[in-house]
Amino acid sequence: MARVCLDYGHGGVDSGAVYKGRCEKDDNLELGLKVAGELRRHGVVVDEVRDKDVFVSLKDRSDFERKNDYDYFISFHRNAFKPEKSKGSETFIYIIGSEKSKELAKRIQTSLVGLGFVDRGVKTANFYVLRETKSPAVLVEVGFIDNSEDNKLFDSKKDEIAKGIAKAILEQLNIKYVETSKVLYRVMAGSYTIKDNAEKQVKRLKELGIDAVIIESK
């Protein structure tokens, strides 16, 4: 069974980058939780370094990952530079990253660019969580938090971004993405020519905790 470790950057007293009252830690958590939900829906075991607004040190993050064997480690972040001066997404792997991490990074980056982010490419870096984790690792910067256009894109397409990242991970795991069904199926529990009998059946169903209504047809 596929198993991944998701790391939502910053948290608690560590806000990460801040712009006009907007905190990176919150964006990272919100997006990451959505990705986790999509992966779990497809049967992937997901362990999260944090699932609420708490501080976790870099060492504790890597220690958490090293306790188990994961197919991949994915760290979520948002970038920052000078207000309104830079924009786009970029995805990082370790300076001597594995082929698997490179493949996943390319899939994630392609997905984000397809949703409208400027392509800043797949890059290498000596980031702690990439260096000190043992599984193939990537760190994704989902746009610049100090760029209004990137924030608008992040907010308006949050679900699509989460879905795109999840699809990239699933593709890397050779798991087919399945769309959620919007079809509703109604169950009939009988047809009666006498209204009193229909009302009795509705009463029985409601006593069992089943929502039921009478629909009259001719």
Segments from the language model and where they lie:
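Active-site-proximal helix/loop segments of hydrolytic enzymes
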Residues: 2-4, 13-14, 22, 26-180
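Solvent-exposed beta-strand motifs enriched in subsets of small alpha/beta binding domains
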Residues: 178-218
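Short, Lys/Arg-enriched, disordered terminal segments
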Residues: 1-2, 218
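Short, polar loop/linker segments at the starts of domains and inter-domain junctions
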Residues: 19, 152-153, 200-205
